[in-house]
Regions:
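A short glycine-rich, Lys/Arg-flanked "PGG" loop and its adjoining helix->strand segment in the class I
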Residues: 178-193
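Core SAM-dependent methyltransferase catalytic element
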Residues: 231-249
């Protein structure tokens, strides 16, 4: 199983390209750029990075919709224990959950079953991904999922409306993480949380490209920069960190 996984990652690596987000730049850039440009630095570009650094970390290239097959690979549950991840969330039936970078809905639809009186806001910047999810919603008669096309700056969520914001192997690809997270914080209810699930940089055995992994310390550093503090950490996933953050104030 492990051997075939390496071949699959190599096969889709050409799909992790930055132009996916570049075409979604908003028109009112001047104010936003002037207020946050100092938090980013330009530097040497890695072959799977964008040459843009945030708090010492090079931002990774984005995985395009052409790599959607990898998101739904049959062995994913065995590799990542996704069902354990979902249990870790401790969702209530009425919760409003935002799945950022929802992709094909691999996490979105199982979560929707866990919040029958709530809803899942499935956010993606690629219309092709949203179209895939819309087709699945129609085929399976799913009514408590709302599709939202976000931007590279904002998930476009209503303020003070979300109980849990979930990033699964997505955060490290955000081209504007500071702006995105500031908007995420605005969307949280008073006791809302952000959950980061990221491949473990500390474990060299995790078969994922370096820029698509993060250390626990780096995750905490970047969340602290937008006013979030670590509430809980679980180490029960084989390849990934599971970190829960809440508002510091």
């Amino acid at each position: 199983m492990r051997k075939s996984f390496f071949f699959l990652v190599l096969g889709i690596s050409i799909c992790w390209i930055q132009p996916v987000s570049a075409q979604l730049e908003p028109t009112n850039l001047s104010n936003a750029k002037s207020s946050t440009s100092s938090v980013y630095k330009r530097g040497e570009r890695s072959w799977d990075g964008i040459g843009k650094y945030y708090l010492g970390r090079e931002i990774a290239q984005v995985m395009s919709h052409q790599g959607a097959m990898w998101l739904d690979r049959p062995e994913r549950e065995e590799e990542e224990r996704s069902s354990v991840l979902w249990n870790n969330l401790n969702l209530s039936s009425t919760d409003v959950v935002a799945d950022i970078g929802a992709g094909t809905g691999y996490h979105t639809f199982p979560l929707a079953k866990r919040v029958p009186q709530g809803k899942v806001l499935a956010v993606d910047i690629q219309q092709e991904m949203l179209d895939m999810m819309a087709e699945r919603m129609k085929e399976n008669n799913i009514s408590n999922v709302e599709l939202i096309r976000g931007s590279i700056w904002s998930p476009r969520l209503p303020e003070n409306s979300v109980d849990l914001v979930l990033f699964v192997d997505v955060y490290h690809e955000l081209s504007h993480p500071n702006e995105m997270m500031q908007n995420i914080v605005k969307s949280l209810t008073d006791d809302g949380v952000v959950v980061l699930v990221e491949y473990k940089m500390e474990d060299p055995a995790v078969p994922i490209k370096t820029l698509h992994k993060m250390t626990k310390a780096q995750c905490e550093k970047e969340m602290d920069a937008v006013g979030l503090k670590l509430k809980e950490y679980k180490n029960n996933l084989p390849w990934q960190h599971f970190l829960v953050f809440e508002k510091a104030n």
